[in-house]
Amino acid sequence: MYNYVMLMGTVVKVQPEFVVNQKYVNLTISCTRPFRNSEGEFETDELVIRCYDFLGELVQERLREGTKVTVKGRLRQSNRDGLCMIIGEHVMFMGEGEMHAIDADGKEDC
C-alpha cells in the first residue's frame, strides 16, 4: 500500500495556524482539472495542503499568491471527524528565475 498525492497549481493563500504545542501552515492552491465538464469548461479546485515544521516555515516565508507550485504529499484521515487532509512533504516552486525544492525533513535544493 502506498499513500501518495501530487498536485500542481497556483498559490491562492498561505495561512499560518497555531494549535496547542503545534504550528503549521495551510497552503491553499488552485488546480485546474485537465478535462472539460459537460458544459465544455475546465473546472478548478481549491485544495488545502497542511505543512508542518521546517517545511511550513519555508512555505510561509517564500510562497506568495500567484506562485506556481508542485506539491508531493500524502492523505491523512482525522481521528476526530473522519475527514481527509493533504499533508505536504515536498514543495517545488519557481522563484527569482530559479527552481526551488523544499522537503519536510529540512532538505532544500535550489
Residue ranges, per PLM feature:
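Single-stranded nucleic acid-binding surfaces, predominantly the OB-fold ssDNA-binding core
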Residues: 1-110
